[in-house]
Amino acid sequence: MSEYRSYTEQMTVLDGDSDFRRCLKPSALFRYVEQVSADHARAYGMDHAFFRERHSAFLVGKQALRVWRMPGRAEKINLTTACEVFKKGTMKRLTTITSETGEKLALVDCRWMIVDTEAGRILRTPGWTMPDFQNDDLPEELPQIVHKSQPLTAAGERRASYSMCDLNGHINNSLYLDIACDALLQEVVEAAPLSFASIKYHREVPMGQTVQVFYAPSGNGWYVLGRREEHAAFECYLEFGSSVTESLQK
């Protein structure tokens, strides 16, 4: 993304963020992307005080992940992030993860919204601009469709415990991938690494509350649904394997 306005950080895959394959967990990859996105904003003066003064906040509405090779434990990776101007109430942010040698490892396509924290409503565009922060257009994108399926199998209930919640007091967006993977049969996640995920965030799950989790096979992957108070809290579509399926290439 060198031809676009972007921001790059180098990170190291921590042991505590690695799974049984000694590779970075997908949820941890989302956390790393979340961090570099926040650092990008702060580098342009958009810190907590900036948003507090403007009574606004960024929220993630949906995001998708494509993995070519998940980085391994202790591997150094580069995260390059770039965002578009707001279009139809959302801001696209692309984050490309590469190795030290330039190998493209993964891509995250995240769609952000801006919220008026006083009025409690989503805005079409923010009431402010930051010079040189955004791009007019980022042509690359990932499929954001969550392939639903029936019948659903119950996978239990998860409580929004202290360790799952972030500085906003609800389950961190990245951890819904853990919840989704935990819902599936163990042989599914053992058979092959995650190659694609798309997730939609419908309702926050505040600390102390619970979410009921369900799953179903869907085409070449799996559909996972989380419900809170009889309403969808999140929906996720997951594929496991070394290559993306034909359905995702359309």
Can you name each region flagged by the protein language model?
Residues 159-241:
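Acidic/His-leaning functional-site neighborhoods
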Residues 3-8, 64-148, 205-207, 216-250:
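HotDog/MaoC-like acyl-thioester-processing domains
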Residues 2-60, 107-109, 115-196:
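Hot-dog-fold acyl-thioester-processing enzymes
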